[in-house]
């Protein structure tokens, strides 16, 4: 542009009409800040790469460093270019300020033009010719000044706007990397599946040959661990002896176990502490074994010796002596089915065959023995006893009636603990009965004489 052909009004007006140097100075500051950030980032990248390559060596670390190094170099170069741009912007702002200062202010140009117009208007007789020439001379100076300022500004700004072009950042990734990664993953999956199948095949083959290779494996292991070449032979010999010993011990164990099992079952069946379970013996077997008939004409005493309850004199059951306390603590003779002449042992309630019932454990033992052995048992006088039972004496009278006896038996079955037992011989029976008539309650008199025991109940009720 030829600024010399333009009047000062245009040149000065354009120079004063713009925003000034403020935007250019702001741009210079921005470029300078960008240069600082880029330089700092490049330094950080470089330090990280140096640390990684120091502790991480290999092909991967080399590839990573090679990919990051160009980017670090680009950031450093871009930082320098940004700093150069900042300097150029600052130079452009300085050129503007210089041109602005050299330009004639528009009001001065306007005043000169106004003065010239007044002189020309009043120059009727030529008296203002000199003043008009002076005004024109000053205006020409303004023209030259503005033209010179604009030419200078154009030259300075053209130099300031010359900056090095910025380069695009280099790529840090491979465009074909995703495809390559997909192929690598597929190959890895295929190789993994093949390895898994191979491993399964090897495991199955090992399991299939484990039994046949056991001796060889153990022998090799023992020889390797002990360092003795014949350690496996010693082990196999000892193992053979162990198997042979087990073959001899097992039959003996079976015999001992069978014997102990039988003893335990026998103890459980005849244990006087554990309540007897009547379900273990069929009712038909009990009835057939005892041989109870409707008449109940004979007692168990004919097949077993009497139980003696004398002081310091042990009782006996067959050839076995029993403690004297058995007769008092668990009497072997208790009324159970005296008046039920039409029934056998099946009529005895199941609940009565337990400890504290009319049949004690001792009596139940004899019942079980009779059932299993098939020995005949007899009861006389309507009472079941371990010795011979005699008829109730005539002096009892009403007590011998069936109704009365049934009531007494029912009471004894409900409350067997209320029965009072008395022991005497035949000579002292009359005196004992006379004494018991005066005492209330239910009394059972046990008679003992020689090898027999006679028992007669007496019932005395108050009221």
From Swiss-Prot:
GO BP term, example: response to host immune response
Stated family: Belongs to the mycobacterial PPE family.
Name of this protein: Uncharacterized PPE family protein PPE30
Organism annotation: Mycobacterium bovis (strain ATCC BAA-935 / AF2122/97)
Gene: PPE30
């Amino acid at each position: 542009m030829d600024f010399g052909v333009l009047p000062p009004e245009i040149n000065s007006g354009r120079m004063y009409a713009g925003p000034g140097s403020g935007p250019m100075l702001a741009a210079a500051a921005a470029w300078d800040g960008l240069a600082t950030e880029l330089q700092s980032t490049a330094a950080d990248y470089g330090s990280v790469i140096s640390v990684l390559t120091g502790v991480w060596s290999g092909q991967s670390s080399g590839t990573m460093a090679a990919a990051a190094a160009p980017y670090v170099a680009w950031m450093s170069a871009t930082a320098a270019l940004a700093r150069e741009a900042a300097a150029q912007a600052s130079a452009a702002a300085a050129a503007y300020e210089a041109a602005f200062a050299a330009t004639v202010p528009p009001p001065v140009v306007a005043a000169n033009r106004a003065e010239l117009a007044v002189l020309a208007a009043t120059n009727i007789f030529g008296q203002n010719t000199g003043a008009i020439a002076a005004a024109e001379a000053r205006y020409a100076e303004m023209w030259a000044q503005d033209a010179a300022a604009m030419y200078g500004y154009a030259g300075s700004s053209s130099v300031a706007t010359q900056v090095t072009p910025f380069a695009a950042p280099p790529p840090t990734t491979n465009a074909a990397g995703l495809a390559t990664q997909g192929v690598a993953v597929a190959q890895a999956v295929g190789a993994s599946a093949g390895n898994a199948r191979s491993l399964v095949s090897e495991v199955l083959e090992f399991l299939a040959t484990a039994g046949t290779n056991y001796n060889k494996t153990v022998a090799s292991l023992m020889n390797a661990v002990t360092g003795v070449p014949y350690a496996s032979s010693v082990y196999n010999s000892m193992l053979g002896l162990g198997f042979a010993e087990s073959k001899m011990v097992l039959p003996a164990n079976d015999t001992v176990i069978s014997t102990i099992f039988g003893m335990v079952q026998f103890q459980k069946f005849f244990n006087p502490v554990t309540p007897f379970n009547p379900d273990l013996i069929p009712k038909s077997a009990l009835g057939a074994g005892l041989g109870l008939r409707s008449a109940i004409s004979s007692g168990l005493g004919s097949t077993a010796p009497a139980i003696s309850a004398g002081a310091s004199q042990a009782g006996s059951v067959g050839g076995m002596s029993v403690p004297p306390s058995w007769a008092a603590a668990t009497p072997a003779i208790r009324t159970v089915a005296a008046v039920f002449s039409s029934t056998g042992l099946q009529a005895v309630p199941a609940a009565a065959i337990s400890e504290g019932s009319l049949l004690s454990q001792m009596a139940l033992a004899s019942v079980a023995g009779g059932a299993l052995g098939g020995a005949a048992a007899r009861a006389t006088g309507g009472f079941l006893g371990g010795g011979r039972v005699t008829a109730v004496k005539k002096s009892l009278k009403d007590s011998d009636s069936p109704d009365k006896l049934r009531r007494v038996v029912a009471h004894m079955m409900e409350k067997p603990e209320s029965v009072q037992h008395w022991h005497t011989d035949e000579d002292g029976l009359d005196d004992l009965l006379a004494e018991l008539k005066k005492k209330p309650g239910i009394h059972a008199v046990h008679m003992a004489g020689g090898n027999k025991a006679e028992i007669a109940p007496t019932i005395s009720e108050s009221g």
